[in-house]
Amino acid sequence: AGQASAMNSDEEQLKRMADPDQWPAPGRDFQLTRHSTLSDITTDNVNKLQMSWAQGTNALRGHEGQPLVIKDVGGKTMLFMVSGCPSMSNCNVVQALDLSDPDNPKQVWSYVKKTDRDESAVPRACCDTVNRGGSYADGKFVYSTLDGFVIALDGQTGKEVWVVKYAYPEKGETITPAPLIANNLVFQGFGGDEFAARGRVAAWNLADGSEAWVCH
């Protein structure tokens, strides 16, 4: 991890956002436009689209996260995606695929947190047990779990770089949104108003997961 540590995360992400062949963040850019400037698909040929390949998540129920496509992850173009959380035994599985051959992607690694999981998060989740994806910068894929963990993984290996516990299902708090990265910080909120959870937003340093601030 840390392949871009000499560069502010904003510079790194803006450079990626300027490349139409990448989908480097939730919503693609800081404005969350969700707009691609690719022009290969047109109104003239859209009716000829066919499925090229598929990758299963082994998780039923809601899927709302956008896969990220990131160039130069250890010299490879990689796709990162996160599943929903139908149960704690199969909750928020991250998969990383090598897109060097875009017609025949290969899974490089997968990750699921195995310890300290909280099954009570499943019935407390509002609007289904979905996950809305993750963010990438400084060689790390950062995402959150339904039961309240914010996790940074090494983009090349899938190994944990840091893990913090942020939301607590016993207090009605669950996480479905993707964390956002800006100015070398990771930002995350949570849901829980249906259970009268007291809201807050927190920021952690991207490098090591140390807490930068919390706002209630």
Regions found by a protein language model. Name each.
Residues 7-57, 103-123, 159-168, 210-216:
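Aromatic (tryptophan-biased) beta-strands that constitute blades/sheets of beta-rich domains
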Residues 23-27, 62-93, 123-150, 174-198:
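Repeat-blade elements of multi-bladed beta-propeller folds
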Residues 41-44, 97, 153-154, 204:
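Hydrophobic/aromatic beta-strand positions that recur at structurally equivalent sites within the blades
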Residues 99-103, 154-157, 206-208:
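Short loop/turn segments that connect beta-strands within beta-propeller blades
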Residues 116-119, 151, 169-171, 195:
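Short gly/pro/ser/thr-enriched loop/turn and capping motifs at secondary-structure boundaries
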